[in-house]
Amino acid sequence: MTYYLDFEKPIQELEIKIEELKKLSDGSDIDLTQEIKRLNKKLKELKTEVFSNLTPWQKTQIARHPERPYTLDYISIIFEDFIELHGDRRFGDDPAVIAGIGKIDGDPYALVGHQKGRTIKERIYRNFGQAHPEGYRKALRVMKLAEKFSIPVITMIDTPGAFPGIGAEERGQAEAIANNLMEMSLLKIPLIGFVIGEGGSGGALALSVCDKIFMLEHAIYSVISPEGCAAILWKKNSDVGVEDYMRAAEELKLTAQDLKKFGIIDDIISEPLGGAHREPQEVGKRIKAKIVSVATELIKIPPDELIKKRYEKFRKIGNFWGSSNRRK
């Protein structure tokens, strides 16, 4: 059964009506072909109208959609012979992070990515995609292994943030994230990142120091969630609500379109009408095509130059022009 977001209710009603007419037509001699065709045309127009005018908060909702494809879904679409590797060799394994080696069109690649989980049981097992320090250390271990064999690394980012629990802090959550930032900036292999859902704070950044970073059309990437931002800035004597979340999402500039404009990401991968969960196979094919084309170019760049370009890429983020006139 399809899960609909609140702003998708008109679409839901129309899709239900079309399904009812199809069942009625199949079980009788009544020919409803033209009516179904008319409603399908109306449905496409409605979807185009709704999804071409999404607010940042609505995009946030789509990025969190429970049916949205996760890292393991894309692995099954994109990779051949994927072998998952476990453990950080220091503490243990973290199911919130998937890491391993596989092939794309016969060529080897390493992949690391967050995994949220689909069912309640799996979400608890995956900790809702919130990685512990051992998850980030496992990811780095696999990236170092890829460097040893000159294999490009693909990262898939989809997390509300790194897990802030006591155990995670005791095992060095901040150090693990910071170490990933440093080590990834020095890897002598191509790094290609994809924000496929939520890109939340340092938990996302720990897999994002890449030569090229791409976002799906309805993904988000931000220093904090709209809810967290609203609670910090505007919570007084009463709880914050949806209007505050909408305002925060607008102010944070967390959409792929905003981030492309600011030069934070390199490009946007379009999604089918309704979001990636409507046609995951098609989105997987688009990601695969981007991986192959970008990796083909990055592999040609000498390692030292690759590291230099990566450094320059991130040094440019946040640069701005100011007035030379200073107040005395």
From Swiss-Prot:
Biological processes per GO annotation: fatty acid biosynthetic process; malonyl-CoA biosynthetic process
EC number, UniProt record: 2.1.3.15
Residue ranges crossing the lipid bilayer per the database entry: none
Disulfide-linked positions: none
Keyword Iron in annotation: no
Cellular compartment(s): Cytoplasm
Pathway where it operates: Lipid metabolism; malonyl-CoA biosynthesis; malonyl-CoA from acetyl-CoA: step 1/1
GO-annotated cellular components: acetyl-CoA carboxylase complex
Domain of life: Bacteria
SUPFAM superfamilies: ClpP/crotonase
Gene3D superfamilies: 2-enoyl-CoA Hydratase, Chain A, domain 1
Catalytic activity: N(6)-carboxybiotinyl-L-lysyl-[protein] + acetyl-CoA = N(6)-biotinyl-L-lysyl-[protein] + malonyl-CoA
Enzyme class: transferase
GO molecular function: acetyl-CoA carboxylase activity; ATP binding; carboxyl- or carbamoyltransferase activity
Primary location class: cytoplasm
Domain CoA carboxyltransferase C-terminal: 38-297
Keywords annotated in UniProt: ATP-binding, Cytoplasm, Fatty acid biosynthesis, Fatty acid metabolism, Lipid biosynthesis, Lipid metabolism, Nucleotide-binding, Transferase
Its biological purpose: Component of the acetyl coenzyme A carboxylase (ACC) complex. First, biotin carboxylase catalyzes the carboxylation of biotin on its carrier protein (BCCP) and then the CO(2) group is transferred by the carboxyltransferase to acetyl-CoA to form malonyl-CoA.
Protein family per UniProt: Belongs to the AccA family.
Cross-referenced NCBIfam families: accA, AccA_sub, PRK05724.1
Assembly, per entry: Acetyl-CoA carboxylase is a heterohexamer composed of biotin carboxyl carrier protein (AccB), biotin carboxylase (AccC) and two subunits each of ACCase subunit alpha (AccA) and ACCase subunit beta (AccD).
Protein name in UniProt: Acetyl-coenzyme A carboxylase carboxyl transferase subunit alpha
Species of origin: Thermodesulfovibrio yellowstonii (strain ATCC 51303 / DSM 11347 / YP87)
Gene: accA
